[in-house]
Structure formats: structure tokens, C-alpha cells
């Protein structure tokens, strides 16, 4: 699958995760609604589904994994930043086929598009500190 299709999958996953975090609806319902309402023709749907399901089912573990690297409590994070960081932590911890630099860069780009003005700097700082611990030296 093309890298652009994976990037689009991440973009869609962040949007769907944001919706899920706010609505607290079942993730399968969020996925169905998202796929029926959004243009997903250039999206790696398989990867989108994996990211969405993986983050949703492991959100608590992902939060625990990132907590030591945050400068504030998870509850104080904006919903967009939380969705982006959860997605990146999922890729870092569960998708070793994705190089850690790619996971970090993609998260930074997502924060630039969807986050507040300086959220990309915050995301970069958290993931730069977290990646060596999560990947245990693997590139």
C-alpha cells in the first residue's frame, strides 16, 4: 500500500478517534458512521480499521504507556492531542513494521493539521521521549 494511503488512514483514524472520545459511542458504530459519511477512496481502509480498533481497545494501556512522558495529566490533554498521541503510541508499541521516526513524523504532521497552534511541538516532545522506551532501542 502506498505511504499516502497510510497517511490518509492515520488522518481518518484521528478524526474517528476524536469522535469516539467525545461521543463515547461504540467504536464499531463510530467506524461505520465515519466510513459512510467521509470520502475514503484514497485511504488504506485495512490500516484505518486496525488503528481505530487497536487504539479504542487499548486506550487505557496506551494512556499508561505515555503518562510518564507527559508534562501534565492525561485528563488535561486536548481531545485532538490525545487522539494523535494514542495513535502514535499504538504504532510505536504494536506496529514495529512502522519505523519509529515515521510514527513520530506522522503524528507531528497530524498535530499541525488538526491540533492547536503549538500542539505539534508538544506531540514531538512527548514522542521523542517515549519512543526509545517504547521501542527499547529498535529503529
From Swiss-Prot:
One protein family per Pfam: NusB
HAMAP family: NusB
Name this protein carries in UniProt: Transcription antitermination protein NusB
Keywords: RNA-binding, Transcription, Transcription antitermination, Transcription regulation
Top-level taxon: Bacteria
NCBIfam families linked: nusB (TIGR01951)
Function, as annotated: Involved in transcription antitermination. Required for transcription of ribosomal RNA (rRNA) genes. Binds specifically to the boxA antiterminator sequence of the ribosomal RNA (rrn) operons.
The family this protein is said to belong to: Belongs to the NusB family.
Any one GO biological process: DNA-templated transcription termination
Recorded GO MF terms: RNA binding
GO CC annotation, single: cytosol
